[in-house]
Amino acid sequence: ELRHLGHLELQKEAWEIEDNESFIFPDDPCFTNPDSMVATIQQYCRDHGMPVPETHGQIIRCIFDSLARRYSEVLGYLREFSETDIKVLHIIGGGSKNDFLNQLTADACGITVLAGPQEGTALGNVMLQAKAAGEVDDIWQMRRIIADSIEIKKYEPTK
C-alpha cells in the first residue's frame, strides 16, 4: 500500500509520467468500494496484460488517463444521439479543481473543458430556493447569476 499524499503532490507525480501504458475501465464493478483501490487497480492491469503501475505517479496517471479516455468514449455516445454538436464539456464539483485531469480531458475529448463551480450542488440548491421565492425568473437567469459569481477555468486541447 502506498503512503498518503496530498492531491497536489499526487498530480505533480502523475504529471511526470510521460508514457502511461496502463488503463482501467472506471465503470468496472471491481472498482466499487474495494478494500484497496491500489491493489484493485494493479490486479486489473495484471489481469488485462498491461504494465502494473507501482509508484504513486504511475497509479494516479493510470486513473487520470483512464477517466479522460472514458469521458471521451461517453462523449462519443452522446454525440451519436445529440442533434447539436457538443463543443464544450462542463465539469462541476470537486473534480473541477483538478487542473491535470481537466487538461487530460480536454486533450482526450478534443474540445474545450470549462471547470467550475466547485460547489455545484449547493449553488443549484440556492438557485432553486431563489426561484421558489420568486427572486429569479428562469433557468437562464440562474445560470447568469452563477456565471457572474464564480470563476470558471478554461482548458483547451493541446493535442
Where are the language model's segments positioned?
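Active-site core segments that coordinate phosphate-bearing ligands/cofactors
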Residues: 1-88, 97-121, 127-158
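Glycine-rich Rossmann-fold phosphate-binding loop(s) that bind the pyrophosphate
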Residues: 94
